[in-house]
Design a protein with these regions (language model features):
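Conserved lysine of the Walker
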Residues: 34
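Structural recognition of the conserved hydrophobic beta-strand(s) that form the central parallel beta-sheet
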Residues: 118-124, 145
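Hydrophobic positions on the alpha1 helix immediately C-terminal to the Walker A/P-loop
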Residues: 37, 41
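Interdomain motor-coupling "hinge/lid" segment immediately C-terminal to the ATP-binding subdomain
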Residues: 130-249, 280
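Short glycine-rich substrate-engagement loop in P-loop NTPases that contacts/grips substrate
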Residues: 55-87
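N-terminal pre-Walker A segment at the start of P-loop NTPase domains
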Residues: 1-17
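Accessory nucleic acid-recognition modules appended to NTPase machines
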Residues: 201-373, 378
């Protein structure tokens, strides 16, 4: 499959040439492109050894049946795979490393004993394995977090470099030309339909076949559900599946652990949801009082909304046929089930630092006869900024104004299908450019 460049490629290249390069742990949900990014980086090395611990029993035995130093481990790996492991010239890649706990533990010793060897590890269910390791190499291992394609990555891979440049330069004083704006909206609609899972994006760019994209999405959904059995043996897969279905039903709303279609207790669903979050399949948006920075200092973890990691998967879970929606000129056909809010949240997440697991926040007031909610709250230039998401080209903003008055905010952002504009203290940012607000 052809490789389409990702923003994380530049971070991996910086790591490759830096004087100090701790072993990298690529973290993220299954099928988000971690292995492909490493293989792309490997083209810059003289030698490349990839070991998949889920598939390679011999590799697991090497790590599980010996207490070897990194040097001796490399000798055994060389004799077994006939690939020279030379510091500065070889990239050593441990894939699906969650299947071999001793291999995870070995990463810290590679940095201590062989600091010039480039080592990357990745795993789709890595968080579960790391939870069971009492001491993990703090300061000796660098984590990078990876997600599906962002809209920026999608445009770049599609060759829309000029459009991307225009979007980056545009602001409320210099909005996009209407023709350019409409083109961006069409591509936004396409991206929200197929989503950012690399296999789907690649298939679309190669064949432009939405039917095949739909088939790949359906296959990914089956694969993701099959993974539920691997999460934690003490929680049945059927219970995790029920929690997952409950999340899908409640996208865009404060999540209720008990709903009318649910047969499990709130406690059972809560435990299952936590596993879905650990697997990276579900993204939490947590309530914050937003009285000051950091936003995470005043959270209420009992109140949160939950997003799915990909809009394309969500569209298929709703049973929507991609080709029919793309041909429908009414953009509202794609905005069912809170997908605009989901897209905005995912773009904010993807535009954040690769080096930390970014938290998303929202604000809500439950006062009697004065309920208000702001979809997202971000920190921008040491200011607290509220963001409201509108699926169309208009919408009231009472909650935004209430928040700004109560918190004395200097600025708010409304993101919608509108072009760049400003009204009083409310800046209008098109949905396709919302990720730029993090930069």
């Amino acid at each position: 499959m052809k490789y389409f460049n990702r923003l994380i490629d530049k971070e991996l290249e910086k790591w490759m040439i830096s004087e100090i390069h701790q072993p990298v742990l690529l973290r993220g949900a299954r099928q988000t492109g971690k292995s492909s990014a490493v293989r792309n980086l490997a083209k810059k090395f003289d030698y490349f050894l990839e070991i998949n611990f889920e598939e390679d029993k011999e590799a697991r035995l090497i790590f599980e049946k010996s207490n070897l130093t990194p040097q001796l481990l490399c000798e055994k790996l060389y004799s077994n795979y006939d690939v020279p492991i030379i510091e500065g010239r070889t990239l050593l890649f441990f894939d699906e490393i969650q299947a071999c706990t001793p291999a995870i533990s070995s990463l810290r010793f590679f940095f201590e004993k062989m600091p010039d060897l480039h080592v990357i590890a990745a795993g789709s269910l890595l968080e579960f394995a790391m939870e069971e390791i009492p001491s993990f190499g703090v300061g000796r291992i660098r984590s990078l977090f990876m997600y599906p394609f962002s809209f920026t990555e999608f445009l770049e891979a599609n060759g829309n470099i000029g459009l991307l440049s225009e979007i980056r330069k545009a602001n409320f004083q210099a909005p996009l030309d209407i023709v350019v704006h409409n083109k961006a909206l069409y591509l936004l609609k396409l991206f929200m339909l197929i989503g950012g899972m690399p296999a789907v994006v690649a298939k679309y760019f190669i064949d432009k076949d939405l039917h095949q994209c739909q088939q790949i999405l359906d296959g990914l959904i089956v694969s993701l559900r099959d993974d539920f059995a691997k999460y934690k043996k003490r929680i049945p897969a059927v219970q995790i599946s029920a929690a997952f279905d409950s999340v899908i039903r409640q996208i865009g709303n404060k999540f209720l652990y008990v709903d009318k279609e649910q047969v499990y207790s709130a406690y059972q669903i809560k435990n299952a949801v936590e596993l879905l979050i650990m697997a990276g399949l579900i993204i939490p948006v947590t309530h914050t009082s937003a009285n000051g920075l950091p936003l995470g200092a005043e959270i209420n973890p009992k109140f949160r909304k939950l997003l799915l990691l990909d809009t394309g998967i969500f569209q298929r879970l709703l049973g929507l046929k991609l080709s029919d929606i793309l041909l429908n000129e009414n953009f509202d056909a794609i905005n069912k089930g809170g997908i605009a809010e989901m897209f905005a949240g995912l773009e904010l997440l993807k535009a954040s630092s690769f080096y930390q697991q970014t938290q998303l926040f929202y604000w809500q007031r439950e006062a009697k006869n004065a309920r208000a909610e702001v979809d997202f709250v971000i920190q921008k230039n040491m200011e607290i900024v509220p963001i409201e998401v509108k699926s169309g080209k208009q919408g009231k903003m009472q909650s935004m104004y209430l928040f700004m008055k109560e918190k004395k905010s200097k600025m708010g952002i409304r993101t919608s299908l509108e072009n760049f504009a400003v009204y009083d203290k409310i800046r209008i940012t098109p949905l396709y450019a919302i990720g730029n607000e993090i930069v």
